[in-house]
Amino acid sequence: MTANRLVLTGTVCKALIRKVSPAGIPHCQFVIEHRSTQEEAGLKRQSWCRMPIIASGKALQTDTHSITVGSKVTVSGFISSHQARNGLFKLVLHAEQIELIDSGD
C-alpha cells in the first residue's frame, strides 16, 4: 500500500451537509479553512487552504454532531480526487478521525 495520510487543523467555514447513500451509509460534508505559518528553506511563510471534508459512516456522525460553522477541528484521513458537476476535479479529505478543539471559552 502506498502512503496517503493527511492531518489538517482548521476552522469550519461552510455549513455541514448531511446525506444518506442508497446503501444506507450516512455522510457528512463540510469545508475547513486552514491558516498557519510554516518554515521552508529557512524562511517563514504563510500557509492557507480550504479543504472539503467527507465523514462517512455511523461512528463519524457522532463526532460531527457538535460541529458548526466556526468550530475548530483537526481532521485525519486520506485524500482523494472528486469530480464536481461542472467536470472539474478537486481534492477531498476523507475523514477517519475528527477532533473538536476546545476554544477555551
Swiss-Prot record:
Domain SSB, first and last residues per copy: 1-102
Quaternary structure and partners: Homodimer. Interacts with PriA and DnaT. Component of the replication restart primosome. Primosome assembly occurs via a 'hand-off' mechanism. PriA binds to replication forks, subsequently PriB then DnaT bind; DnaT then displaces ssDNA to generate the helicase loading substrate.
GO cellular component, one term: primosome complex
Keywords from the UniProt entry: DNA replication, DNA-binding, Primosome
One protein family per Pfam: SSB_1
Keyword Electron transport annotated: no
Native organism taxonomy: Bacteria, Pseudomonadati, Pseudomonadota, Gammaproteobacteria, Enterobacterales
Described purpose of this protein according to its UniProt entry: Involved in the restart of stalled replication forks, which reloads the replicative helicase on sites other than the origin of replication; the PriA-PriB pathway is the major replication restart pathway. During primosome assembly it facilitates complex formation between PriA and DnaT on DNA; stabilizes PriA on DNA. Stimulates the DNA unwinding activity of PriA helicase.
An example molecular function term from Gene Ontology annotations: single-stranded DNA binding
Family: Belongs to the PriB family.
Protein name: Replication restart protein PriB
GO biological process: DNA replication, synthesis of primer
Matching PROSITE patterns: SSB
Source organism superkingdom: Bacteria
Record keyword Magnesium present: no
